[in-house]
UniProtKB/Swiss-Prot annotation:
InterPro entries: DNA_mismatch_repair_MutS_C, DNA_mismatch_repair_MutS_core, DNA_mismatch_repair_MutS_sf, MSSS, MutS, MutS2, P-loop_NTPase, Smr_dom. Homodimer. Binds to stalled ribosomes, contacting rRNA. The keyword DNA-binding applies. CDD domains: ABC_MutS2. The keyword RNA-binding applies. This is Endonuclease MutS2. Residues 704-779 form the Smr domain. Pfam families: MSSS, MutS_V, Smr. The gene is mutS2. PANTHER family: OS10G0509000 PROTEIN, OS10G0509000 PROTEIN-RELATED. Keywords: ATP-binding, DNA-binding, Endonuclease, Hydrolase, Nuclease, Nucleotide-binding, RNA-binding, rRNA-binding. It comes from Streptococcus agalactiae serotype III (strain NEM316). GO terms for biological process: mismatch repair; negative regulation of DNA recombination; rescue of stalled ribosome. ATP binds at residues 328-335. It comes from the Bacteria.
Length: 779
């Protein structure tokens, strides 16, 4: 599509309306490159994405995405084997975290049926290993001391040396106070110094690093701290070297994943762009138009996007209709209507919502041409007419049946009679070429052309004779007429003069009466349509209110059911805890073997009341993502009767499967277990399985990682993990639950507080996970 139309209709200003809604630099780049598309499937895809985003907002009322800088240059540098600085790594860390958050957000979506966005969400990749490593970079762009053992050692030594220097200098401040200009420790060239009065410079031995501008103060590094300061200087150099080494290592970690990270960044930016388009649509009461298979246009209550408080109008361009000619005097809003049509079409073909009501329809044109300039008159120079005619000639040479042509004041700038003839001839050529055209003119001759010619329709802008001002209401099918006599009368022109003027135009009186009747009929039809629209709006508000109440009721019902389930689960947990106590006593007396204890515990669990979870959203979602393929050796499974997780190890000749479930090997039929969906990142690396080894209480500690788990799944794994740890006499275990929303962390705390076998538990030290991990002492 030609770029000139974008300038003429100020399409860039429309794009600026969307800019405030964007949060990522990637989406800003996408907006800047946005242009009208000429392929209906691509436009339809853009509209489907907005519809999907609307569903997300209806269900969740928000779609969170953080501000992200562009990482394109950083990724190019990685491809060139360059190392990234810490700020570049911090931005990539945010992209990785945002990708993970978006994946979890998508997995939690309920009652949303996507048409296009699902492919974007599913193409996002997670990098748990990279994210774990990048925890060493804090949000302030600083490397944490636990980034490497060497960095921790250097910083510890640095802290100790600086503390010793401060202590020595603090003592000297007290002892040599009368020799100092100020009672403080200063810094010069990265070394700690004392501000000594120049007259006493020889009283303190050391190295002079600076002299004040007045010469009254000398900054001396006392000899007592010279060696320590040199040590600090060396340690800082070592620190910089180690930080550079760590940044190099981080860059090497990222290099194999550049293409995937780039794809993630693009998806996040595109989702942000779709979000912005939806918010623009919502705030401006815009809609997603339908796309016609032919050149049909139907814009209902369409508004100009760049005007404040624009007047809404209906415009219908049926398939058979070739041209609409807007006639009537100037200053009535004809040019605005012309631009409104052009901008609505440009926005729609760019995949943007259109400022029109639901049910509106756009066509798909290969090109849109316009000759729109300042209003012309016969007093203007011939050069202006020549300029416009040159442009019109160019349009006629390039336009075809897949084009939309817009002419403002066609034929103006020359003799009225010749101009009107030229305008009719140009419109006739476009009509015969089947090219959709809208033209404005103040020539009365074109009214007759619009009435007498097939597939051409007149239109005009409404004028309020009472207020003597235009209403900017578009009246399709009604030719424009002059209101000169009414205006002159209301402004006080003598009645006999007005009467005489009317007599001089008797030949046009019949036409004017017909136009007046058409105007009256159009206004009456519009009033009826407005009344119908008011009723439709009331019905729409009522339907929305009913839907909102239903959603609120469903939400409250789900909360109550969840609460009841939790209470029931607590009762079951209490019973199971009692059984654990009995089993532990038996184990302590060596009356049962470990596998016999687990079998006994499974029998006890069968006594627990069975809860009907057929309508549980979480379990239903788990069923949805269950692998739709035959099981294979190595697949992760959940044993239905036990609710425990295991791994398929082999298949027997009779079709049954052998599975390792904790420390027990089981034989199962295929209907006794379900497959667990394996994340993409787990396909490229061996799955890490937490194994509790037999050891005494002072031996190695077991670790359970619950990050990314569902609440029910996490609690089940935690219960099984503690069981195995107790059976194997583990004295201490680590549970990694992350920080996240805090749901898993709170669940772990509640479980440990209730479990009688837990002697003590507390968050891990800061360098071992902090509040993202819990250390548990068993006994």
């Amino acid at each position: 599509m030609n770029n000139k139309i974008l300038e003429q209709l100020e399409f860039n200003k429309v794009k600026e309306l969307i800019l405030p809604y964007l949060k990522t630099e990637q989406s800003q780049e996408e907006l800047s490159e946005l242009e009208p598309m000429t392929e209906a499937p691509k436009i339809e895809k853009s509209f489907n994405e907005i519809s999907d985003m609307e569903q997300i907002f209806v269900e969740h009322h928000s779609f969170g995405i953080v501000s992200l800088s562009s990482i394109s240059e950083s990724l190019k540098r990685l491809e060139l084997s360059a190392d990234l600085n810490i700020q570049e790594l911090l931005v990539i860390k945010k992209v990785l975290q945002s990708s993970s958050d978006m994946i979890h957000f998508y997995s939690d979506l309920d009652n949303v049926s996507f048409q296009s966005l699902d492919r974007l969400f599913e193409n996002l990749e997670q990098f748990p290993n990279l994210q774990g490593s990048f925890q060493a970079i804090n949000d302030g762009g600083f490397l944490e001391h636990f980034a490497s053992p060497e960095l921790e050692r250097i910083r510890r030594q640095l802290t100790n040396s600086e503390r010793r220097v401060r202590q020595i200098l603090q003592d000297m401040l007290k002892e040599k106070a009368e020799l100092l200009s100020e009672n403080l420790i200063a810094s010069r060239s990265g070394r700690s110094v004392l501000p000594v009065k120049n007259t006493y410079r020889n009283r303190i031995s050391g190295v002079v690093h600076d002299i004040s501008s007045s010469g009254s103060t000398v900054y001396i590094e006392p000899r007592a701290v010279v060696t320590l300061n040199e040590e600090i200087t060396q340690l800082r150099a070592d620190e910089r070297h180690e930080e550079s080494r760590i940044l190099h290592a981080f860059s090497d970690l990222l290099r194999p994943h550049v293409a995937t990270i780039r794809n993630n960044a693009w998806i996040l930016g595109h989702l942000d762009f779709v979000r912005a388009k939806y918010l623009f649509m919502s705030d401006n009461k815009a809609t997603i138009p339908e796309i016609s298979n032919d050149s049909t246009l139907a814009l209902i209550n369409v508004r100009h996007p760049l005007l404040s408080n624009p007047v809404a109008n209906d415009l219908h361009f049926d398939q058979d209709l070739t041209a609409i000619v807007i006639t009537g005097p100037n200053t009535g809003g004809k040019t605005i209507m012309l631009k409104t049509l052009g901008l609505a079409q440009l926005m729609g073909q760019s995949g943007l919502p259109v400022l029109a009501d639901k049910g509106s329809k756009i066509a798909v044109f290969n090109n849109i041409f316009a000759d729109i300039g300042d209003e012309q008159s016969i007093e203007q120079s011939l050069s202006t007419f020549s300029s416009h005619m040159t442009h019109i000639v160019s349009i006629l040479n390039e336009a075809d049946h897949n084009s939309l042509v817009l002419f403002d004041e066609l034929g103006a700038g020359t003799d009225p009679q010749e101009g009107a003839s030229l305008a009719m001839a140009i419109l006739e050529h476009l009509r015969l070429s089947n090219i959709k055209t809208m033209a404005t003119t103040h020539y009365p001759e074109l009214k007759a052309y619009g009435i007498e010619t097939n597939f051409v329709e007149n239109a005009s802008m409404e004028f309020d004779a009472e207020t003597l001002s235009p209403t900017y209401r578009f009246m399709q099918g009604v030719p424009g007429r002059s209101n000169a006599f009414e205006i002159a009368s209301r402004l006080g022109l003598a009645p006999f003069i007005v009467k005489q003027a009317k007599q001089m135009t008797d030949s046009d009186s019949d036409v004017n009466r017909i136009i007046e009747q058409l105007e009256a009929q159009t206004l009456e039809t519009r009033r009826r349509l407005d009344h119908i629209k008011e009723i439709e709006q009331e019905n729409l508000k009522f339907n929305r209110a009913v839907k909102k109440l239903y959603n609120e009721f469903s939400h409250e019902r789900d909360k109550e059911l969840e609460k009841i389930y939790q209470e029931a689960q607590e009762i079951v947990d209490m019973a199971l805890n009692e059984s654990d106590t009995i089993l532990k006593k038996l184990n302590d007396k060596s009356q049962l073997k470990p596998h016999e204890i687990i079998d006994a515990k499974a029998q006890i669990k069968k006594l627990a009341p069975q809860v009907d979870l057929s309508k549980n959203k979480v379990l239903n979602k788990a069923k949805k993502i269950k692998a739709a393929r035959a099981p294979r050796i190595g697949d992760d499974i959940i044993v239905t009767s036990y609710g425990q997780r295991g791994t398929l190890t082999s298949q027997l000749k009779d079709g049954r499967w052998e599975a390792q479930v904790g420390i027990i090997k089981m034989t199962l039929t295929q209907d006794e277990f379900t497959l667990v969906r394996v994340q993409e990142e787990q396909k490229v690396k061996s799955k890490q399985i937490n194994v509790v080894k037999k050891a005494d209480s002072s031996g190695p500690r077991a670790r359970l990682d619950l990050r990314g788990k569902r609440y029910e799944e996490a609690m089940q794994e935690l219960d099984n993990f503690i069981d195995q740890a107790l059976l194997n006499n583990m004295g201490q275990v680590d549970i990694i639950h992350g920080i996240g929303t805090g749901v898993i962390r709170e669940g772990v705390t509640k479980y440990l507080r209730r479990n009688k076998h837990v002697k003590h538990f507390a968050y891990a030290p800061q360098n071992a996970g902090g509040s993202g991990a819990t250390i548990v002492t068993l006994g």
